[in-house]
């Protein structure tokens, strides 16, 4: 079992943790989150980005992690970036707790997400279904109020 965690911080009140667990290289990965400080009753995009570099804030993380050269999509789509996690929903206080299982995100192997950045976005991810070219790259999810590098957890 490999476990990892990203501690989310940024230039906003958004903060939290996202944890990852993968039993072995052939297993799906469980992604769990506890994120606070978002807008109430909203859907916010979150993605794994290419780089674990936050020297200039969350913008240094680069584009979505996309080792297979696909277009942006929903987590359940066959064609999507490895880093496409979709949206999480917030409650009346702007908080969100949840988990999902993902078949593309890996902690073990050549396409591991360890050392990359988990970014929470300021807008809703359109899951690549928008009319613009940007939809196929980013899901039009907007600014990056919080992020954290994915590191090995105890």
UniProtKB/Swiss-Prot annotation:
Residues 124-144 are annotated as: Disordered. Keywords: Antioxidant, Copper, Cytoplasm, Disulfide bond, Metal-binding, Oxidoreductase, Zinc. Cu cation binds at residues 47, 49, 64, 121. It is found in: Cytoplasm. It catalyses: 2 superoxide + 2 H(+) = H2O2 + O2. This is Superoxide dismutase [Cu-Zn]. CDD domains: Cu-Zn_Superoxide_Dismutase. It holds the Pfam family Sod_Cu. Residues 124-137 have a biased composition (Basic and acidic residues). Binds 1 copper ion per subunit. The keyword Disulfide bond applies. Homodimer. Disulfide bonds join 58-147. Destroys radicals which are normally produced within the cells and which are toxic to biological systems. Zn(2+) binds at residues 64, 72, 81, 84. Its cofactor is Cu cation; Zn(2+). Belongs to the Cu-Zn superoxide dismutase family. Substrate binds at residue 144. GO terms for cellular component: cytosol; extracellular region; mitochondrial intermembrane space; nucleus; superoxide dismutase complex. GO terms for molecular function: copper ion binding; oxidoreductase activity, acting on a sulfur group of donors, oxygen as acceptor; superoxide dismutase activity. One of its GO terms (biological process) is cellular response to iron ion starvation. Its EC number is 1.15.1.1.
